[in-house]
Structure formats: structure tokens, C-alpha cells
Amino acid sequence: MSMKQKLLLLMGGMMLTAFSLPLAAQSISWTDDSQKPDTLWYTEHKEGTEYTLTKPEELAGLSVLVNTYQYTFEGKTIKLGNDVSLAKTVGEETVLWTPVGLYIKGHKIDIPFKGTFDGQGHTVDGMQVSGTIEAVGLFGNLSGATVRNLVIGSNSSVTSTNSSAQIGSVAGLLTKSRILNCTNHMPVSSPGGTNVYVGGIIGRMNVSGYIGGCKNYGEVSNPGSVGGITASTNKADTVVNCVNYGKVTGKDADNSYTGGIVGYLYEDSR
């Protein structure tokens, strides 16, 4: 068996593991084949550097392309051409959103989005995330990425019962990435624990991240670390010109941190 074949088998096994863990039994996801996620906008135009998405199926396709096929979109820009609603039910079941980019620490799965996502001032609404996903938001895992000019609507809701979750409206985990001029209106919460991070915009920042010009209006709550913009920073992270208007609820306990803007500010952050 060639090295390439071995790698493909390993990747396939990782992805089966990844998708079997986060979602509750029999839940319906936007990335399911039954919901017809559209990946053709990319797979038929891989040579391009800029793509404009206008449909929820195309946005779901982005999740499939990153999480399953591990296209990072590094050096490429994705734009929203209009507001997009992810509100959908099948029978009595809500169709859940699968965040773009995976991070499952215990299984050593780290699959980030590395491109630029420009909302162009448009709103993504109706996003619903629940279950035991570890990195939660429209994006789960960002590394070397930029997300800008994006609005998350008030009819969305994200949470997780994972004991090590990182939960935010825009993204769960941020590494060496920039979040610029983004606004959140939805509630962000977790039943929590001391290892859970919940932020209005970003769950947890992890090394050399930058959040600038962002606003949060949604209620943010978590018994662990919680912040109106982000729950926690790390080495060389920066949060500037951000405003929180939402209610922030934490818990007075050891290793739990609560802040209107940042829950826990690392010594090398600002």
C-alpha cells in the first residue's frame, strides 16, 4: 500500500470518528447528504481565489469541504452575497449546523479553516448548534484565517455539553487569526465546567489572535470562563475597539473567570 493510500485511509478514519462523536443520535445536520450541501461552487472552480456564496446549501458545502475533504482555503476569499438563513426543520427535527473546521483535542483532530471569509455586512441567522461538539460557532476552528464584516442574527443559538467546549457565535477556537467588524445578536451558552470557554464572538483565543471592532448584543452565560467578546486570551492575543451590550453571566468559583469584554486576560495579551 502506498503512503498516499495509507494517508487517505487514516484521514477517512479520523473523519468517521469526528462525525460520530459530536452530534446526538439521529440528529439531522446541514452537512448530511439528505440536505444536499453544495460543494460544486468550489470543486468545479478550484483554480479560483474568490467565491461568493448566496445559499445555505453552499455554506453547508463549505463545512463539508473543510471538515471532510480538508480543503483549508488558505489564500482564498469567500464572500457572502446576501443574508443567509440556516433555519430549517425536517418533520419535528431542527436541522443542526456543523461548524466549519474541527477541533477534538482528545482525538488529536485539528482541521482548521485558513482562508478569508467576508460577510460584506450580511447576516447569517437561524443557525442552531447543540450536542457535544468541542469547537462551536459558525466556524469551529480558525487558524491563520480572517473573518470580517459578518453579522450573526438573533434567531440563532449555539451551545454544547462537551466538558472541554469552546463556544462563540463567529468561532469556537481562534489561532493566529483575525476577527474584524463582526456583530453577534444571538445567545451563547453552556451548562459548562471549568474547562469550558464561552464568548459572544469567540470562545477561546489561542496565540497571536486579533479581534477588532466587534460588537456583542447577545446574552452570554457559562459556569466556567465567559466574556462578552471572548472567554479567554492566550499568548500575544489582542482585543481592541470592541463593545459588549449583552448580559454576561458567570459563576464565582475557582478557575472560573467572567468579564464584560474578556473573561480571562493572559499576561501577554492586551
Model-derived features with residue positions:
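Surface-exposed repetitive/solenoidal architectures
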Residues: Q26-R270
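Bacterial N-terminal signal peptides
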Residues: M11-P22
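Nuclease and nuclease-like effector domains acting on nucleic acids or nucleotide cofactors
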Residues: M3, F19, A25
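Bacterial N-terminal signal peptides that target proteins for export
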Residues: M1-M11
